[in-house]
Amino acid sequence: MNNYNDSEIAAIHNYGVDIKNREIFLHSYLVDNDEEPGVDYKSAIIFEKNIRHLNLISSDPILIHMHIPGGDWEDCLGMYDTIKFSKAKTIMLTYAKAQSASSILLQAPNIRILMPNVNVLIHYGSISMDSEHSKAATATVQWNEKECDKMVDIFVDRCMQSQMAKEKNWKKMMAKKHIMSQLANKCDWILTAEEAVSYGFADDILGSKKYPSIDSLKKIK
């Protein structure tokens, strides 16, 4: 049993990091109103600092508890890259939902575990072009198309490692075509935890034989 002093407890609640146990709590930056900002520059900056700090201490695994909805695409990619370039192995446990931007974040860690009732929502997102000059608007649309393709590729890479892809004997382009068709037909593609695992968008569900509890995640080396 760990005994925490006041500053360690404050770090968990104010900065989302348990340094002693190498755990990060990724959620929206807490504000005084009822709106949940989701992935934004505030949550991203705190998260990036926490990952860097724990990496400077040691290369022991980091457990990330994620409970955050969608949000800003660029801040999402900043967090995604931070996880991908962590020298320490990263394990993510997702609570409640992985929607839009946070479904992308779910693809970054080495090991991705879902709570049993998590839903995963994947879509292309949206862009704003209020009062933009026509040339600027065209550039924004072109950039958005490239970023949408980048997003699909992130999911395709994970899907290609799944049992489903092996059973269907999918080549990479076949998996990409399937994912794009799901996004085109459904707009918001919503998957249960079990479906997300079957597609390779997560590795397992908490409570399984391999990962029966949160404590079992702490034993991963």
Where are these regions (language model features)?
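N-terminal organellar transit peptides
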Residues: 1-221
